[in-house]
Amino acid sequence: MSTAYVYDGTLEGMLSCVFEAYASKEDPLDIVEESSFAPRLGQREKIVATDRNRARRVEEGLIRVCGREAYEAVGIVHCSDDPAKGRAILEFVRYAMKRGKGAWRDVAHKKVAAFAQMERAVRNEKHRWLQFLRFEQVEGGVYIARCNPEANVVALLMDWFSARFNTQDFVIYDEVRHIAGVSRGGSWIMVEAPVFDAAPATEEERVVAKAWKRFYDEVSIEARTNHGLRANFMPKRFWKNMTEMKQAPLREGSFEAGPAKGDGFGAGAVRVGKAALISGSPCSSARHRPKSCG
């Protein structure tokens, strides 16, 4: 009978599953988040509680034997939406603990191939959003950006943008997972955001957005227009939140204006409903956030 490990979806939880597999000498067929668990026929379910001490031991052991790059790769892969990521991480850790430093480079090895493919996909998704994410200033002085990524990369984006805009308050909202990264004063947190409303765009923002869209339209050379090539380099799933790709002129409150409440930013710039801190999101924990996430 096959076994499925079920955990809470955090990186600490995933590392706890790795520890459990070693401690119990089991080889679980699946390691899945509780929110998406669907057991196979006749499969035994084993709920693995998150244990930070166990997670820390796995982290420290992986860094000691395999190098920090291997641990950082685990953090990146855990941001994937692939349901097989848990099993891929376990197989990689087992191989890496035997192989030692450089194991994460053995991308052709059967124990590393799936892991490496997921890591590459997450890094590529992050890279695309670094290019195509667009911020909009709303009343209250906060900059808002929306995204619909194919991996849980908001925490990775927060590391990058917070390091560069450490004096600017901003929010990056994931429309797919209903979570938001909130940065203020150079530090940031991840919160659950089932409701996300923002104040209207500032007058300056509307002027700049209109100018940017006009520049984008005017700088193109009609005779060299190639819509297929553009869609290849800039997939259409990014377009709806890109200022230059909006068909109509920016209207006041291009983000849904709602009954704004004070949120610490001033002037009710952003409301995220009953926001709840995500203390163990894939890369949000101070201890478990890979440095390379930025």
Q: Where do the protein language model's features map onto the residues?
A:
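N-terminal ordered "arm"
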Residues: M1-R52
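Long, compositionally biased intrinsically disordered terminal regions
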Residues: D169, A180-G181, G185, P200-G266, ...
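Cysteine-cluster motifs in flexible loop/terminal segments that predominantly coordinate metals
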Residues: C283-P290
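Internal, well-folded beta-alpha domain core
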Residues: G102-A193
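Charged, alpha-helical interface segments at or near domain boundaries
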Residues: V32-W129
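Short, hydrophobic/amphipathic alpha-helical patches that form generic packing surfaces
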Residues: G13-S24, L90-K98, R120, L156-A163, ...
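Acidic, Ser/Thr-rich peripheral helices and adjacent loops at domain boundaries
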Residues: K46-R54, S187-A201
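Short coil/turn segments at secondary-structure boundaries
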Residues: E72-V77, D106, E175-V176, T225-A231
